[in-house]
Every structure is written in structure tokens, then in C-alpha cells.
UniProtKB/Swiss-Prot annotation:
Disulfide pattern: 87-116, 273-284
Name of this protein: Carboxylesterase 1C
Lineage: Eukaryota, Metazoa, Chordata, Craniata, Vertebrata
Sequence motif Prevents secretion from ER, residues: 551-554
Organism: Mus musculus (Mouse)
Modified residues (Phosphoserine): 473
Length: 554
């Protein structure tokens, strides 16, 4: 019996595929963390996975509506093998988003908590050596109100491209954005959490096989917007070295355009908090339970009130357009892109409550433009001209619907991306643009057959979903391998090009870009006509100022 036990004990430390069977344990500045090894078919080196590693103290009590603080140290080996809870958010939408964009084979268990400042790490490195691999830090999307790190499995990207992948979480909704406009609650807690995670990466990622001097931040939708905020923020200096914004940038958003006093009067009424002073209101809101704040958040949605990133003089010293014009930002190489049909299916599905009878026609388009006109930086007087420009006398209802959805895709994603890319180029930044146009098989049964390149579709290919999920075609698998190679080459070198790949031109005065899909090819002047139309229209019709808007606060 003792011999049997001895044999098994010896096997437990016997190197197999270059690794012992013992799970990985890594030192961090707070203490040791225990992970797990996961092997991917075709790769000798397993990936070391660490889930739910804390990068800040739980933002509870007095730390609600306050800057994140470093995590408390621990003296034991912390188990980092389970997914962390997502930050506080609407559970129904959290499940929809998680199930829709997850690159996992299995449906993730849904856990939500205000204690949520954790990150996940996927490292293909031999942790017994100093590997100095490129690091890619993912910032999830979800409108800054829903989402989490764990649906995005970094296993395939990490193994195939030999990079360390980190997925981070940050406070959302009222927890991540509430601002009084003064020192009592300046706001931008979501972005301060993102910055805290990046500082943690600088201090710790070398022990996980990563190179802290080669960090790429990348994100989609509001994650892409967050990437651009961090690029424009002086607080981002030296925390990252390359950036990728997928389907979202900070240009033409509602950043800094909210009248804080008007919004907070509504929050005060909903919460029954005394708003006679900022300090009293913040203190009152800190006493509310998580469920009470969730209820308040739900009512804000009913009132069509959205909180936003603020021009606080710290995270963002000025309006994004001013920072870009002054060229006073982190001039790191940058990939900017969006998808062919950003409003193809998922976003209209999420806006069903705003669509009368689910129809998309001139009346609905006008309604939505009026609903979002302050966020879009347009005046209501412009709306008829905008609709006429896109419809151009078309009578067929199906074609009208398609053109209107294209219009919203341009307004929210395409035109801001081009404007940012031009500003980056003019500042001397190495810039690359793409348009993604492909229909993943994973969602083919959920959406109309005509939708190709919907919002978020590129995520499946960036994270190697065809290599993780069952049923992918050879074309999908090859497309994913190509996209991962582009993204990882950029993370390694600041240039996506490499051997065996279609050439991706740098975005210069010729405005060359890459169309990525079943056929991947170069093209020029992405959305040039649409940008020219909007630029001319805005010059003739400056946005109106109304009681619910203002330019900035300091």
C-alpha cells in the first residue's frame, strides 16, 4: 500500500509535457495565487489560467464612489481557479450579453456582486522562467452598464499567439459613473478601476511570464471607448504601449455633455437622498443597499437617463476633441475599426422598447434620433436632412429599414472611428483601420440571414471561438487564426503585418484600410462620403444647448 502511495506521489511531481502535475502558484505584490493548467489540442505547452485575482479592495462602504485602493495583502495561497462575480448590473441583461458573446463551450454561471474588482490571466509561459511575453489586456463592452471579464476566454489567443491575455472588470452603471461634479464624487470610477488594473499588471505580470513594457489594451464597444479614454488620459502614461478599439471610440459620444445637477435631482428623488449638498447626497447613497441602487438604476433607464464618462480634469482634463486637436495624449500605435452592420441585429434587439411595433422606418428613425440627439452631438433641426440623405427617395420598406440601420451604424461607430483615425494619423501615430464583415455560425439561428458583421461579431474571431466551440467551419477557423495573428503581431511589434498575412496598409493620407472577412483585402477611404456629409451638416447646424446638457465640468 505504501508503495502504491509512493508511486502516485512521485507521479504528482513528474514532468509531463514540460510541466509537473502540480497546479501553478505565482507570487503577486499582495500574496501567492493558485491557478490551474488547461491544455489546448495541438499545443505541448498548457496555458496557466488564474481566475478572479483581486487588483483592488472591494469598493464597498466608504469606497463606493471613491478611487480604487490596492488590494489587501494575504499570507495564504489564494485559490484563483473560479470565475469572479460580475460587477453590479441588471441580471437579465447580464445573462443575455454573457451568453451571446461568451467564447466558452459551456454557459457560465451568473454571479453578480458589488465586490467585483478582479481580473483573469491566461499565460502560455513556462512560469519557471522569465519569458517576457507580450501582454494583451481586454476591456469588456456593455455600455458601461453590463458585462464582465469571464465570458471572454483568453485560452486560444494565448496559446496560438504566445501572449499573456488579461481580462479585467470595472464598476458599472451608477457604481462606475455617478458624479456630483465636485470633490465629493468626481465620477469616472469605471476608468479609474481600469487604470488600477493596468497598474497591477505593471507590478505583477512579469511573474506570470508577461512583459510589463509590452502591454496592449484592447476592447469592444464601451470597452473600445474606454481604450480611447485611456489613450487620451494623462493617467494612462506608461501603463500601456499599444491600443485597439473595436466598434467604439470616445469621439461623438455623450462624454461631458450631461447636466450633472439635473441628473442628480432625479437620482435624489428616486433614492430619497437629500441633495442640498453633494457631501450629504454621496453619504446617503453610500448607505443604500446594492439592491436599492439596482432599483434606482432601473428607474433611470425608464426615465431615459444615462450616466457617462466625465471631463473631470483628472482622467480627462478636457473634451476629447480638444485633447486630440492639441495632440496632448499617449501617442501609442493604434488599431481602430468597426463592423459592416453595427446596427444589424443585436442593438435594435436591445432597443425594442423604443421601437413602435418593432418597425424601422422614417418615423422610428426620427424618434430615435430625437431620443439620442444630445449623445450624438446633433441638433433636432438636422434630423430631416439626415434621414433624407440616407433614404434618398427609397420606397421599399425592407430597403428603408436596412438604410436606416446603416445610418445609425455610421453615426455611433463608423464616423467617430474615421474621425479618431484621422486625428491619430495627423498627430503622427501609427494607425491601422479595419472593417469587419463576416457572419459567425454561432449566431446564425438567432438573427436575419441578411446580417453580416453585426455589433460584436469580431470578438468570436479575436478570441479564437472557432477553436474553442464545436461546429465551426474551416473558413471560420482560418479567419480566426488570421485575426488573432493580426492582433498579436500588433501587440508584439506595433504593426499587424507578418508573413503569410494579407497586407494591412497604415492609415495615411490615402486612408487605406483592411476589409476583414471571407475575403480579406485592402480598400481606401472608409466612410469618406458619410464623414464629409456629417462634417458639413454639423458646420451648418451647431448642436443646440438645452437644460439637460452642458459642455464640461471641472
Amino acid at each position: 500500500m505504501w508503495l502504491h502511495a509512493l508511486v502516485w506521489a512521485s507521479l504528482a511531481v513528474c514532468p509531463i509535457l514540460g510541466h509537473s502535475l502540480l497546479p501553478p502558484v505565482v507570487d503577486t505584490t499582495q500574496g501567492k495565487v493558485l491557478g490551474k493548467y488547461i491544455s489546448l489540442e495541438g499545443f505541448e505547452q498548457p496555458v496557466a489560467v488564474f481566475l478572479g485575482v483581486p487588483f483592488a479592495k472591494p469598493p464597498l462602504g466608504s469606497l463606493r464612489f471613491a478611487p480604487p485602493q490596492p488590494a489587501e495583502p494575504w499570507s495564504f495561497v489564494k485559490n484563483a481557479t473560479s470565475y469572479p462575480p460580475m460587477c453590479s448590473q441588471d441580471a437579465g441583461w447580464a445573462k443575455i450579453l454573457s451568453d451571446m458573446f461568451s467564447t466558452e463551450k459551456e454557459i457560465l454561471p451568473l454571479k453578480i456582486s458589488e465586490d467585483c474588482l478582479y481580473l483573469n490571466i491566461y499565460s502560455p509561459a513556462d512560469l519557471t522562467k522569465s519569458s517576457q511575453l507580450p501582454v494583451m489586456v481586454w476591456i469588456h463592452g456593455g455600455g458601461l452598464v453590463i458585462g464582465g471579464a469571464s465570458p471572454y476566454n483568453g485560452l486560444a489567443l494565448s496559446a496560438h499567439e504566445n501572449v499573456v491575455v488579461v481580462t479585467i472588470q470595472y464598476r458599472l452603471g451608477i457604481w462606475g459613473l455617478f458624479s456630483t461634479g465636485d470633490e465629493h464624487s468626481p465620477g469616472n470610477w469605471a476608468h479609474l478601476d481600469q487604470l488600477a488594473a493596468l497598474r497591477w499588471v505593471q507590478d505583477n505580470i512579469a511573474n506570470f511570464g508577461g512583459n510589463p513594457d509590452s502591454v496592449t489594451i484592447f476592447g469592444e464597444s464601451s470597452g473600445g471607448i474606454s481604450v480611447s479614454v485611456l489613450v487620451l488620459s494623462p493617467l494612462g502614461k506608461d501603463l500601456f504601449h499599444r491600443a485597439i478599439s473595436e466598434s467604439g471610440v470616445v469621439i461623438n459620444t455623450n462624454v461631458g455633455k450631461k447636466n450633472i445637477q439635473a441628473v442628480n435631482e432625479i437620482i435624489a428623488t428616486l433614492s430619497q437622498c437629500n441633495d442640498t449638498s453633494s457631501a450629504a447626497m454621496v453619504q446617503c447613497l453610500r448607505q443604500k443597499t446594492e439592491s436599492e441602487l439596482l432599483e434606482i438604476s432601473g428607474k433611470l433607464v425608464q426615465y431615459n437617463i444615462s450616466l457617462s464618462t466625465m471631463i473631470d480634469g483628472v482622467v480627462l482634463p478636457k473634451a476629447p476633441e480638444e485633447i486630440l486637436a492639441e495632440k496632448s495624449f499617449n501617442t501609442v500605435p493604434y488599431i481602430v475599426g468597426f463592423n459592416k452592420q453595427e446596427f444589424g441585429w443585436i442593438i435594435p434587439m436591445m432597443l425594442q422598447n423604443l421601437l413602435p411595433e418593432g418597425k424601422m422606418n422614417e418615423e422610428t428613425a426620427s424618434l430615435l434620433l430625437r431620443r439620442f440627439h444630445s449623445e450624438l452631438n446633433i441638433s433636432e433641426s438636422m434630423i430631416p436632412a439626415v434621414i433624407e440623405q440616407y433614404l434618398r427617395g427609397v420606397d421599399d420598406p425592407a430597403k428603408k429599414s436596412e438604410l436606416i440601420l446603416d445610418m445609425f451604424g455610421d453615426i455611433f461607430f463608423g464616423i467617430p472611428a474615421v474621425l479618431l483615425s484621422r486625428s491619430l494619423r495627423d498627430a503622427g501615430v501609427s494607425t491601422y483601420m479595419y472593417e469587419f464583415r463576416y457572419r459567425p455560425s454561432f449566431v446564425s439561428d438567432k438573427r436575419p440571414q441578411t446580417v453580416e458583421g453585426d455589433h460584436g461579431d469580431e470578438i468570436f474571431f479575436v478570441f479564437g471561438a472557432p477553436l474553442l466551440k464545436e461546429g465551426a467551419s474551416e473558413e471560420e477557423t482560418n479567419l480566426s487564426k488570421m485575426v488573432m495573428k493580426f492582433w498579436a503581431n500588433f501587440a508584439r511589434n506595433g504593426n499587424p503585418n507578418g508573413e503569410g498575412l494579407p497586407h494591412w496598409p497604415e492609415y495615411d493620407e490615402q486612408e487605406g484600410y483592411l476589409q476583414i472577412g471571407a475575403t480579406t483585402q485592402q480598400a481606401q477611404r472608409l466612410k469618406a462620403e458619410e464623414v464629409a456629409f456629417w462634417t458639413e451638416l454639423l458646420a451648418k447646424n451647431p448642436p443646440e444647448t438645452d437644460p439637460t446638457e452642458h459642455t464640461e465640468h471641472k
